[in-house]
Amino acid sequence: AALVAALGVTCLGGCQAGSTGGDTAVNGKGVKIYVSLSQADAFCNTLIDAAKKTAEASGAEIVVYDAENSIENQVAQIKQAVAEDYDAIMCGPVDADTALELEALAGDIPIVFYNSCPDASVLEPDKYIYVGSDEGVAGQYQAEYILDQMSDKDEINVVLLKGPKNHSATKGRSEEFKNTLKASGKKINVVFEDNADWEQGIAEDYFDLFLQTGKQFDAVVCN
C-alpha cells in the first residue's frame, strides 16, 4: 500500500526519491493524487489508509473516491481528476480491460494501477504502471496445499469458487491453480466452478446449489 502511494508521487517529474535498505523517501510537496477505488471493502480500505498516511507524510494531497464497481462511475472520476488538475491518479480498475480507455481520458496525467492488473501491452514505464502481487503464485500455493493434504489420492474432485470475472487476480490465481494441479500427474476433476465475487453470501448460495447435485468432492477452493 505504501509503495502504491510512493509510486503515485514518483511518477511525476521533479520529485526526489531515494532508497536505502528497502525504505523509500519521497518528496511529494505540492502533489495532488486522485484515487479511484473499484469498490470499497475491508481490503481496499486497509490499502487506502496506508496510502493516505504515506502521501501525507511526503507532503502530498490525496483524495479518494469509490466507483462502486461501476465502469461509468470510474470513467467520470478520471474525467474529474483531469478537470481538477490532479498530478497523478491511483486506480483500482473496475475492469482491467478498460485501462486503455482510462489512459486516453487521463491524457498527460500518469496512472498507477493497483489490485487488478491491466494487460502488459497498455502499460508504459514511468507513466502507466501496475503495483501488485504475482497472482499466479497465490494460485500455485493453493494447489500445492491441496496436493500436500491429499498426497495419498490419485484422483481429486475440486469445487472452485472464484472472485470477480474481470479481475486479474481471479484470472491469474485460477489459471495457475489449475496448471499446478494438472502438472502433478493426478486426475483432477473440477466438479463445480463459478464466480462468487469474493462475497460470502454468494459463495454459500453456490455451494448449497452444488450440494444438491450429489456430486462427490474432496476440496473447496475460494480464490
What are these regions (language model features)?
Residues 1, 5, 14-223:
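A residue-level marker of the well-folded mature domains of exported/periplasmic proteins
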